[in-house]
């Protein structure tokens, strides 16, 4: 689309006008921000949000052409049909669905599948388990995507070596593994120092995409006719069977679109949309149309068109730039996996995980060792198992299309329950999105035997883990509650017949403030003493990402010995109990960490035949509970102030 850069033809003016209309529609309710700040955010969005979709041209068009070829032969109509499908898919799915609609469905500024789930659960209280199940499936598919993205991205970039130096072909897989192992190994150091260059590198990458595509559009300018949807429709109808398979490959051009919503909280809607409309979208289109024009004039180039259309003098720089871009894309996905894992822990979908902060200034920069290890192992195994990016392509589409399908379903609930749209207004839009999503999903699901099993397998395992944890914690709560004593009764008894009173404050953590904490009961049973001040502490996770400090703590006094404190954190916030309790000073309780002891109960779980869950699920839940991060570390309580009391529970 040369006109979109030089502005010399009517198609360029139409594109600019369309961009203005779309941007106006997207920002109708937002005020202007400072230009310099906006430029910085747009540049940052290029480095984080668009790495995945920005590296798709390396392999997406190639895979679509391979699928469209009949007996290895491509007709002109096939090439125009494929590039037309890519253009309209990017327009309808990314520009219309995500930019105009999904990005508006923020949960107090945050995006992502779990944020959307939490938003919908708050609005649709009648069927919380159904929405939870949908959210779990979406999160599992996201993690599946997080495994495949680094593998296919870096592998596809390294395959450029086959063009630069064919004798290096045997080293493609080993070099990919070395890069990925290095990438995962340095995660614990944090990305703050290097992330500053992500934006400029990706900006250079998009310029290279656009320039190389624009240059080759002049090989056959008639390729611009593919902007007409006629070519896409004709391709779909002339040979439906071939077209159906090709649609699954065309979807590779959109992998990474979900990142627009997932990273909403990092940059805000306006920078993400501007980066897409004015930089990413035009450059992607120029490259795809350039590849199509190059193949129309060089029919033998369908093997690796992205690299084959690069001049020989620029091949090495392009391979290096592509490698850097795919590493950045992988880093963005890894960071996203940490963020989703933290949300899942806070929403009690996963057991507690050790979370390390890698920046003193930016709380969002975190490192989760267990997620990093498992993700890294899975990525390396995929690379060694599939060996070529074309083999991984089948596995890639299922995870992303499934995630997009879940997003569409939840978006309908947001439209009707939160935006208060009439069904007659929301349903036609959602049905349109569902038709497109189902087309892409069904075209990818048939590739199970070609590699799609990997994506489904990863998602299935994660769904089992998350649902087992949710079900197990509920079952454990119900079982222990039956054996617990009401807190009101204990408080009343202690007032009538108080045991020996010792100085200081005791804080008892509990998930059920109506029942006496197990640690309190065992303390009374074994030590037969009661502290001067006893705090029954409950930590609650809100259905919104952030809770202000002013709303963090609620304090209610039972009597002179007992008080109930509830601390509320957003699902994007890391609980810090001592710091939060310090806020209680303004509520009348002068918290002093040096005179306070924290009593925690550590449960030893044993599987039971009559637990209410299958035995295998009992054992899996027990394993997950044993691997959970220590509560002392997770809640950031000083170890010297903690007393742990062990109990055994049969589940």
From Swiss-Prot:
GO terms for cellular component: plasma membrane. The keyword Secreted does not apply. GO terms for molecular function: potassium ion transmembrane transporter activity; symporter activity. Keywords: Cell inner membrane, Cell membrane, Ion transport, Membrane, Potassium, Potassium transport, Symport, Transmembrane, Transmembrane helix, Transport. It catalyses: K(+)(in) + H(+)(in) = K(+)(out) + H(+)(out). Disulfide bonds: none annotated. Pfam families: K_trans (PF02705), K_trans_C (PF22776). It is found in: Cell inner membrane. It comes from the Bacteria. It is a multi-pass membrane protein. The chain crosses the membrane at residues 41-61, 82-102, 130-150, 163-183, 194-214, 235-255, 276-296, 309-329, 366-386, 395-415, 426-446, 450-470. Transport of potassium into the cell. Likely operates as a K(+):H(+) symporter. Belongs to the HAK/KUP transporter (TC 2.A.72) family. This is Probable potassium transport system protein Kup. It comes from Brucella melitensis biotype 1 (strain ATCC 23456 / CCUG 17765 / NCTC 10094 / 16M).
């Amino acid at each position: 689309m040369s006109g979109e850069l030089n502005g010399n033809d009517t198609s360029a003016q139409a594109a600019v006008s369309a961009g203005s209309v779309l941007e106006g529609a997207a920002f109708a309710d937002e005020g202007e921000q400072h230009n310099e700040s906006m430029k910085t955010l747009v540049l940052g969005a290029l480095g984080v949000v668009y790495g995945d979709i920005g590296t798709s041209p390396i392999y997406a068009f190639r895979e679509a052409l391979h699928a469209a070829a009949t007996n290895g032969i491509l007709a002109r109509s096939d090439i125009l049909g494929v590039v037309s499908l890519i253009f309209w898919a990017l327009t309808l799915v990314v520009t219309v669905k995500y930019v105009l609609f999904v990005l508006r469905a923020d949960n107090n500024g945050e995006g992502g599948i779990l944020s959307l789930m939490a938003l919908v659960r708050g609005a649709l209280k009648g069927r919380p388990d159904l929405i939870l199940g949908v959210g779990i499936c979406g999160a599992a598919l996201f993690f599946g995507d997080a495994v495949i993205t680094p593998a296919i991205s870096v592998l596809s970039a390294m395959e450029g070596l086959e063009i630069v130096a064919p004798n290096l072909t045997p080293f493609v897989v080993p070099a990919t593994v070395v890069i990925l192992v290095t990438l995962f190994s340095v995660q614990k150091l944090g990305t703050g120092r290097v992330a500053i260059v992500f934006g400029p590198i990706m900006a250079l990458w998009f310029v290279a995409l656009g320039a190389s595509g624009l240059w080759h559009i002049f090989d056959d300018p008639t390729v611009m006719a593919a902007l007409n949807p006629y070519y896409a429709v004709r391709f779909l109808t002339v040979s439906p069977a071939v077209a159906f398979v090709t649609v699954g490959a065309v979807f590779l051009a959109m992998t990474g679109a979900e990142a627009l919503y997932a990273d909403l909280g990092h940059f805000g809607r306006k920078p993400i949309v501007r980066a897409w409309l004015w930089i990413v979208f035009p450059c992607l289109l120029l490259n795809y149309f350039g590849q199509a024009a190059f193949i129309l004039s060089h029919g033998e180039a369908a093997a690796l068109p992205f690299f084959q259309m690069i001049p020989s003098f620029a091949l090495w720089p392009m391979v290096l730039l592509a490698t850097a871009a795919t590493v950045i894309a992988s880093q963005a996905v890894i960071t996203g996996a940490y963020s989703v894992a933290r949300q899942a822990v806070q929403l009690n979908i996963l057991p507690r995980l050790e979370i390390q902060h890698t920046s003193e200034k930016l709380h969002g920069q975190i490192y989760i060792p267990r997620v990093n290890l498992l993700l890294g192992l899975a990525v390396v195994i995929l690379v060694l198992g599939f060996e070529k990016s074309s083999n991984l392509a089948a596995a890639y589409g299922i995870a992303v299309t499934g995630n997009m399908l879940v997003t569409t379903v939840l978006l309908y609930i947001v439209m009707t329950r939160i935006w208060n749209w009439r069904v007659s207004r929301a349903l036609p839009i959602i049905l349109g999105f569902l038709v497109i999503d189902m087309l892409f999903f069904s075209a990818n699901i048939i590739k199970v035997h070609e590699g799609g099993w990997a994506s489904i397998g990863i998602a299935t395992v994660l769904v089992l883990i998350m649902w087992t944890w949710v079900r197990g914690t509920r079952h454990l709560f119900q079982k222990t509650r039956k054996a617990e004593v009401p807190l009101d009764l204990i408080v009343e008894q202690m007032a009538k017949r108080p045991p020996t009173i010792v100085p200081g404050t005791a804080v008892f953590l509990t998930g059920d403030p109506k029942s006496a904490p197990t640690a309190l009961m065992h303390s009374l049973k074994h030590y037969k003493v009661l502290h001067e001040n006893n705090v029954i502490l409950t930590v609650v996770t809100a259905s919104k990402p952030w809770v202000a400090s002013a709303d963090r703590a609620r304090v209610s006094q039972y009597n002179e010995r007992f008080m109930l404190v509830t601390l509320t954190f957003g699902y994007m916030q890391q609980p810090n109990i001592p710091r939060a309790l310090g806020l209680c000073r303004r509520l009348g309780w002068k918290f002093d960490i040096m005179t306070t002891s924290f009593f925690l109960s550590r449960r030893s779980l044993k599987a039971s035949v009559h637990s209410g869950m299958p035995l295998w699920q009992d054992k899996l839940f027990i394993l997950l509970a044993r691997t959970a991060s220590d509560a002392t570390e997770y809640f950031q309580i000083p170890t010297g102030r903690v007393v742990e009391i062990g109990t055994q529970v049969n589940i």
